[in-house]
């Protein structure tokens, strides 16, 4: 049995990237869908500046993902559209120990 690393990604958006974020979003979602299909996506979502006003923009995103190694995660991040297109200013990577929900 391979033990996967569970990793929390806190991704911070650059200011003024809402339009670009929305344009690139389908590519970003496609990659997350692939991780989900492979059973390696624990959770993912955007962090809106105002949950009632989509035009307010985003602070960034949170993703909790599973990879075999840190190197595999780094390779995956190299192709992340939000990073490649300059939407994310940076990504903080930290280990994550899932406690709940069980299963």
Predicted features and spans:
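Conserved, structured core segments of small domains
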Residues: 1-103
């Amino acid at each position: 049995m391979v033990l996967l690393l569970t990793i929390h990604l806190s991704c911070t958006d650059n200011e003024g990237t809402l339009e670009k974020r929305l344009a690139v979003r389908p590519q970003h979602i496609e990659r997350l869908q692939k991780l989900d299909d492979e059973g390696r996506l624990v959770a993912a979502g955007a962090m809106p500046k105002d949950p009632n006003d989509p035009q307010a923009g985003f602070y960034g995103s949170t993703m909790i993902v599973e990879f075999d190694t840190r190197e595999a995660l780094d390779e995956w991040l190299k192709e992340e559209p939000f990073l490649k297109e300059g939407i994310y200013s940076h990504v903080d990577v930290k280990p994550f120990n899932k406690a709940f929900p069980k299963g």
